[in-house]
Amino acid sequence: MPTRRRVALLTLLTAGTLVAREAQRNATHSDPAARAAAVRRKVAVATWAAPTEGRLMTRIVVDADPVLDYVARRRAEGAKGLTPMHVLGAAAGRALRVVPEANTRVRAGRPVSFDDVAVGFAVDIGQGTDLAPVKVVGADVLTPAQIATRVWTGVTALRDGTDPGFSRTTRVAALVPALAMKPLLKASDLVLGALGRPLLGQVGNPLGAVFISNVAPLGVEEVFLAPVPFARAAVYISQGTITERAVVRDGAVVAVRQFTLCLTGDHRLVDGVQCAIFFDALVGLLKDPDRLG
Protein backbone atom coordinates (compact mmCIF):
# COMPACT_ATOMS: atom_id res chain seq x y z
CA MET A 1 0.00 0.00 0.00
CA PRO A 2 1.44 3.44 -0.94
CA THR A 3 2.71 5.53 1.96
CA ARG A 4 0.11 8.29 1.49
CA ARG A 5 -2.75 5.79 1.64
CA ARG A 6 -1.32 4.21 4.78
CA VAL A 7 -1.03 7.63 6.43
CA ALA A 8 -4.58 8.55 5.42
CA LEU A 9 -5.93 5.22 6.67
CA LEU A 10 -4.03 5.56 9.94
CA THR A 11 -5.36 9.10 10.37
CA LEU A 12 -8.95 7.97 9.82
CA LEU A 13 -8.56 5.05 12.22
CA THR A 14 -7.01 7.31 14.86
CA ALA A 15 -9.76 9.91 14.46
CA GLY A 16 -12.41 7.22 14.66
CA THR A 17 -10.84 5.80 17.80
CA LEU A 18 -10.67 9.24 19.44
CA VAL A 19 -14.31 9.97 18.60
CA ALA A 20 -15.35 6.58 19.96
CA ARG A 21 -13.41 7.16 23.16
CA GLU A 22 -14.94 10.62 23.53
CA ALA A 23 -18.42 9.17 23.07
CA GLN A 24 -17.65 6.47 25.64
CA ARG A 25 -16.31 9.09 28.05
CA ASN A 26 -19.50 11.13 27.60
CA ALA A 27 -21.60 8.04 28.23
CA THR A 28 -20.00 7.63 31.66
CA HIS A 29 -21.75 10.84 32.73
CA SER A 30 -25.27 9.62 33.45
CA ASP A 31 -26.29 12.99 34.85
CA PRO A 32 -27.18 15.51 32.07
CA ALA A 33 -25.74 18.32 34.18
CA ALA A 34 -22.43 16.45 34.49
CA ARG A 35 -22.34 15.88 30.74
CA ALA A 36 -23.00 19.56 30.07
CA ALA A 37 -20.29 20.59 32.54
CA ALA A 38 -17.79 18.21 30.92
CA VAL A 39 -18.48 19.61 27.46
CA ARG A 40 -18.24 23.19 28.70
CA ARG A 41 -14.91 22.47 30.42
CA LYS A 42 -13.50 20.86 27.28
CA VAL A 43 -14.46 23.90 25.23
CA ALA A 44 -12.96 26.23 27.85
CA VAL A 45 -9.63 24.38 27.86
CA ALA A 46 -9.43 24.63 24.07
CA THR A 47 -10.59 28.26 23.95
CA TRP A 48 -8.11 30.07 26.16
CA ALA A 49 -4.34 30.16 26.28
CA ALA A 50 -1.95 32.60 27.93
CA PRO A 51 -3.24 36.15 27.37
CA THR A 52 -1.55 38.00 24.52
CA GLU A 53 -4.07 40.75 23.72
CA GLY A 54 -4.41 44.04 25.54
CA ARG A 55 -7.47 44.40 27.77
CA LEU A 56 -8.89 47.41 29.54
CA MET A 57 -10.62 46.65 32.83
CA THR A 58 -12.62 49.07 34.94
CA ARG A 59 -15.54 49.12 37.36
CA ILE A 60 -18.21 51.57 38.42
CA VAL A 61 -20.85 51.61 41.15
CA VAL A 62 -24.39 52.52 40.10
CA ASP A 63 -27.38 53.55 42.22
CA ALA A 64 -29.99 50.83 41.84
CA ASP A 65 -33.17 52.67 42.81
CA PRO A 66 -33.81 54.42 39.46
CA VAL A 67 -33.51 51.10 37.63
CA LEU A 68 -35.57 49.18 40.19
CA ASP A 69 -38.32 51.81 40.17
CA TYR A 70 -38.39 51.75 36.36
CA VAL A 71 -38.62 47.94 36.29
CA ALA A 72 -41.43 47.94 38.86
CA ARG A 73 -43.44 50.52 36.90
CA ARG A 74 -42.98 48.82 33.54
CA ARG A 75 -43.86 45.40 34.95
CA ALA A 76 -47.02 46.87 36.46
CA GLU A 77 -47.83 48.12 32.96
CA GLY A 78 -47.43 44.62 31.52
CA ALA A 79 -43.72 44.22 30.73
CA LYS A 80 -43.40 40.52 31.57
CA GLY A 81 -40.05 39.21 32.76
CA LEU A 82 -38.36 42.61 32.73
CA THR A 83 -35.25 42.76 34.96
CA PRO A 84 -32.41 45.24 35.53
CA MET A 85 -30.26 43.17 33.15
CA HIS A 86 -32.56 44.03 30.24
CA VAL A 87 -32.43 47.71 31.17
CA LEU A 88 -28.64 47.44 31.19
CA GLY A 89 -28.74 45.80 27.75
CA ALA A 90 -30.83 48.61 26.28
CA ALA A 91 -28.50 51.19 27.80
CA ALA A 92 -25.46 49.36 26.40
CA GLY A 93 -27.03 49.36 22.94
CA ARG A 94 -27.48 53.14 23.08
CA ALA A 95 -23.93 53.57 24.40
CA LEU A 96 -22.63 51.75 21.31
CA ARG A 97 -24.07 54.57 19.21
CA VAL A 98 -22.10 57.07 21.29
CA VAL A 99 -18.87 55.04 20.93
CA PRO A 100 -19.12 53.35 17.51
CA GLU A 101 -15.53 52.11 17.88
CA ALA A 102 -16.91 49.56 20.35
CA ASN A 103 -19.31 48.23 17.72
CA THR A 104 -16.47 46.66 15.74
CA ARG A 105 -14.34 43.54 15.63
CA VAL A 106 -10.84 42.86 14.34
CA ARG A 107 -10.68 41.21 10.92
CA ALA A 108 -7.49 40.71 8.92
CA GLY A 109 -5.64 42.97 11.33
CA ARG A 110 -7.96 45.97 11.14
CA PRO A 111 -11.19 47.10 12.86
CA VAL A 112 -14.36 46.34 10.90
CA SER A 113 -17.77 47.69 11.94
CA PHE A 114 -20.67 45.35 12.59
CA ASP A 115 -23.64 45.65 10.25
CA ASP A 116 -26.00 46.03 13.21
CA VAL A 117 -25.98 46.83 16.91
CA ALA A 118 -26.29 43.61 18.89
CA VAL A 119 -25.96 42.84 22.59
CA GLY A 120 -25.51 39.32 23.93
CA PHE A 121 -26.75 38.02 27.27
CA ALA A 122 -25.45 35.06 29.27
CA VAL A 123 -28.46 33.02 30.39
CA ASP A 124 -28.75 30.08 32.76
CA ILE A 125 -30.25 27.05 31.04
CA GLY A 126 -29.38 24.35 33.56
CA GLN A 127 -30.14 25.72 37.02
CA GLY A 128 -26.57 26.91 37.42
CA THR A 129 -24.91 24.00 35.60
CA ASP A 130 -24.89 25.38 32.06
CA LEU A 131 -24.90 28.75 30.35
CA ALA A 132 -25.68 29.84 26.81
CA PRO A 133 -25.74 33.17 24.96
CA VAL A 134 -28.82 34.91 23.63
CA LYS A 135 -28.03 37.57 21.04
CA VAL A 136 -30.42 40.49 20.59
CA VAL A 137 -30.06 42.49 17.37
CA GLY A 138 -31.21 46.11 17.31
CA ALA A 139 -30.41 46.74 20.97
CA ASP A 140 -29.83 50.41 20.21
CA VAL A 141 -33.50 50.98 19.35
CA LEU A 142 -35.39 48.32 21.31
CA THR A 143 -36.97 49.19 24.65
CA PRO A 144 -35.95 47.19 27.72
CA ALA A 145 -39.33 45.42 27.60
CA GLN A 146 -38.77 44.40 23.97
CA ILE A 147 -35.30 43.14 24.82
CA ALA A 148 -36.74 41.15 27.73
CA THR A 149 -39.26 39.49 25.40
CA ARG A 150 -36.53 38.46 22.96
CA VAL A 151 -34.23 37.21 25.67
CA TRP A 152 -36.94 35.11 27.32
CA THR A 153 -37.97 33.67 23.95
CA GLY A 154 -34.38 32.54 23.48
CA VAL A 155 -34.14 31.21 27.03
CA THR A 156 -37.31 29.15 26.61
CA ALA A 157 -36.03 27.54 23.41
CA LEU A 158 -32.65 26.79 25.00
CA ARG A 159 -34.14 25.28 28.15
CA ASP A 160 -36.71 23.22 26.23
CA GLY A 161 -34.05 21.90 23.87
CA THR A 162 -35.92 23.31 20.88
CA ASP A 163 -33.11 25.64 19.81
CA PRO A 164 -31.67 23.62 16.90
CA GLY A 165 -28.44 25.60 16.72
CA PHE A 166 -27.46 25.15 20.36
CA SER A 167 -28.39 21.46 20.31
CA ARG A 168 -26.22 20.89 17.24
CA THR A 169 -23.28 22.78 18.75
CA THR A 170 -23.52 20.78 21.96
CA ARG A 171 -23.61 17.46 20.11
CA VAL A 172 -20.57 18.36 18.02
CA ALA A 173 -18.60 19.61 21.04
CA ALA A 174 -19.42 16.43 22.95
CA LEU A 175 -18.09 14.16 20.18
CA VAL A 176 -15.02 16.10 19.08
CA PRO A 177 -11.86 14.69 20.71
CA ALA A 178 -10.10 17.08 23.07
CA LEU A 179 -7.03 17.24 20.80
CA ALA A 180 -9.20 18.38 17.90
CA MET A 181 -11.12 20.99 19.88
CA LYS A 182 -8.52 23.75 19.56
CA PRO A 183 -8.29 23.51 15.73
CA LEU A 184 -12.09 23.51 15.58
CA LEU A 185 -12.24 26.68 17.66
CA LYS A 186 -9.57 28.25 15.46
CA ALA A 187 -11.87 27.63 12.51
CA SER A 188 -14.76 29.04 14.55
CA ASP A 189 -12.71 32.17 15.20
CA LEU A 190 -12.37 32.76 11.47
CA VAL A 191 -15.93 31.91 10.45
CA LEU A 192 -17.97 33.04 13.46
CA GLY A 193 -15.82 35.95 14.60
CA ALA A 194 -13.99 37.42 11.64
CA LEU A 195 -16.47 36.70 8.86
CA GLY A 196 -19.58 36.79 11.05
CA ARG A 197 -21.01 33.69 9.37
CA PRO A 198 -22.99 30.90 11.07
CA LEU A 199 -21.18 27.66 11.87
CA LEU A 200 -22.32 24.39 13.47
CA GLY A 201 -25.53 25.93 14.74
CA GLN A 202 -24.01 29.13 16.11
CA VAL A 203 -24.94 32.48 14.59
CA GLY A 204 -22.17 34.79 13.44
CA ASN A 205 -20.65 36.89 16.22
CA PRO A 206 -22.80 35.03 18.77
CA LEU A 207 -22.11 37.41 21.67
CA GLY A 208 -22.75 40.66 19.81
CA ALA A 209 -20.52 43.70 20.25
CA VAL A 210 -21.30 43.88 23.98
CA PHE A 211 -21.81 40.78 26.12
CA ILE A 212 -23.57 41.05 29.49
CA SER A 213 -23.56 38.53 32.32
CA ASN A 214 -25.67 38.99 35.44
CA VAL A 215 -23.67 37.41 38.27
CA ALA A 216 -26.05 38.65 40.98
CA PRO A 217 -27.87 35.28 41.32
CA LEU A 218 -24.51 33.83 42.42
CA GLY A 219 -24.31 36.36 45.24
CA VAL A 220 -21.27 37.98 43.61
CA GLU A 221 -20.82 41.74 43.81
CA GLU A 222 -18.24 42.06 41.06
CA VAL A 223 -16.26 39.94 38.61
CA PHE A 224 -14.37 40.69 35.41
CA LEU A 225 -15.46 38.45 32.56
CA ALA A 226 -12.96 36.48 30.48
CA PRO A 227 -13.32 37.43 26.80
CA VAL A 228 -14.10 34.60 24.38
CA PRO A 229 -11.62 34.90 21.48
CA PHE A 230 -13.75 33.42 18.70
CA ALA A 231 -16.74 35.66 19.54
CA ARG A 232 -14.74 38.87 19.00
CA ALA A 233 -16.96 41.00 21.24
CA ALA A 234 -15.39 44.37 22.01
CA VAL A 235 -16.89 44.90 25.48
CA TYR A 236 -17.87 42.52 28.30
CA ILE A 237 -19.94 43.73 31.25
CA SER A 238 -20.83 41.91 34.45
CA GLN A 239 -23.68 43.07 36.68
CA GLY A 240 -23.25 42.34 40.37
CA THR A 241 -25.72 41.82 43.17
CA ILE A 242 -27.67 44.78 44.57
CA THR A 243 -26.62 45.64 48.12
CA GLU A 244 -27.17 48.46 50.58
CA ARG A 245 -24.00 50.48 51.01
CA ALA A 246 -23.02 53.41 53.20
CA VAL A 247 -22.63 56.47 50.99
CA VAL A 248 -21.88 60.09 51.83
CA ARG A 249 -24.51 62.39 50.32
CA ASP A 250 -24.59 66.12 51.13
CA GLY A 251 -22.26 65.56 54.06
CA ALA A 252 -24.37 62.80 55.63
CA VAL A 253 -23.90 59.04 55.58
CA VAL A 254 -26.95 57.31 54.10
CA ALA A 255 -27.79 53.76 53.04
CA VAL A 256 -28.12 53.47 49.26
CA ARG A 257 -28.96 50.41 47.18
CA GLN A 258 -26.22 49.99 44.59
CA PHE A 259 -24.70 47.46 42.20
CA THR A 260 -21.31 47.25 40.52
CA LEU A 261 -20.65 47.01 36.80
CA CYS A 262 -17.29 45.58 35.70
CA LEU A 263 -16.17 46.26 32.13
CA THR A 264 -13.55 44.41 30.12
CA GLY A 265 -12.70 46.10 26.81
CA ASP A 266 -10.60 45.02 23.82
CA HIS A 267 -7.76 47.55 23.81
CA ARG A 268 -7.26 47.04 20.07
CA LEU A 269 -10.66 48.66 19.51
CA VAL A 270 -11.25 51.00 22.44
CA ASP A 271 -8.88 52.99 24.60
CA GLY A 272 -9.28 54.40 28.09
CA VAL A 273 -11.01 57.58 26.96
CA GLN A 274 -13.52 55.68 24.83
CA CYS A 275 -14.26 53.28 27.68
CA ALA A 276 -14.88 56.27 29.94
CA ILE A 277 -17.24 57.83 27.38
CA PHE A 278 -19.04 54.49 26.94
CA PHE A 279 -19.49 54.09 30.71
CA ASP A 280 -20.61 57.71 31.08
CA ALA A 281 -23.33 57.22 28.45
CA LEU A 282 -24.32 53.90 30.01
CA VAL A 283 -24.59 55.22 33.56
CA GLY A 284 -26.44 58.33 32.40
CA LEU A 285 -29.17 56.12 30.95
CA LEU A 286 -29.30 53.94 34.07
CA LYS A 287 -29.84 57.07 36.16
CA ASP A 288 -32.79 58.03 33.93
CA PRO A 289 -34.05 54.79 32.34
CA ASP A 290 -37.27 56.42 31.16
CA ARG A 291 -35.16 57.69 28.25
CA LEU A 292 -34.96 54.06 27.07
CA GLY A 293 -38.70 53.90 26.42
Residue map of PLM features:
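C-terminal catalytic/motor cores of large multi-domain enzyme assemblies
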Residues: P2-G293
